[in-house]
Amino acid sequence: MPQTIASPPTPEYDLEEVAARLDEGGVDLGDPASVDRCAALLGGLARNRDFLADRLVADLKAAHAGQLAANRYSAQVVLLHRSRRGHFLRANIWPSASDEAYRTSGARAFSYGVPHDHNFHFLTAGYWGPGYVSDYYDYDAEAVDGRRGEPLNLRFVERSSLGEGRMLLYRAHRDVHSQLPPERLSVSLNIMDEGEHVPWRDQYLVDLGTDAARWGTIASRPTLTPTEALLRCAVHLTDNARDIADHMAVSHPVPRVRASAIAALAAVADGTGRTAALERGLRDADARVRDDCERWLTL
């Protein structure tokens, strides 16, 4: 499960100071020294009981006046700061099952009941409320190919909540959690270590359903870069895109992108051409590509 981080005895910080100090020192949550420094800053921000309310009110006023240049909101996320150095700071809002947002949008809009790992490290602190509840597991990424349906050999650790003052370090490709809504509306603060490499790494959604044969296996890999999405569209419009897809299917260093290129080529081919495109993927060096193509051949 995520590593519990003792919140350092730091003073209260405001958002601007935390953002500036993160930008100055950078964020590398794979480095213990960086984790300690970020934990001190996040802990100091979490002690500031006014900054988030002030920020939300200011943004609402700006939006009402037509002055908000960029919408920072999704169903649950408030983007507080994005750095050019590849990290960002955000607040996540977690509605309870009785809140109108939950009833309107449903559980999946807030990732409740969607077991998953992460393809990046992030540091999180409970800011307000009892916090979301998680069943925590861990797994050994080195023992996993990443094929759909592959067992992760999960190890259950505990069920606990991210209450006020609790701080956790979620580790990429190691920690899995299945979240449940809090007893009442809650807020967490996150420092996200999302560098340029992250979009090329797979995230796993995990099957923790009632089918014993599938329990603890990889249900899907939802990560998709803009390049992959664009390629799948462009091959329908121009032969030049098909040439690019043909090249990427062989030479791209990321297995998922090679598989996406093969899928794009197969989508614009008929009959034996589709089969030939997918059979080409059966010779790929990576098990994920071979498995994807084998599955697509049966469809």
Regions found by a protein language model. Give the residues of each.
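Amphipathic alpha-helical scaffolding segments comprising HEAT/armadillo-like alpha-solenoid repeats
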Residues: D239-A249, G271-G281
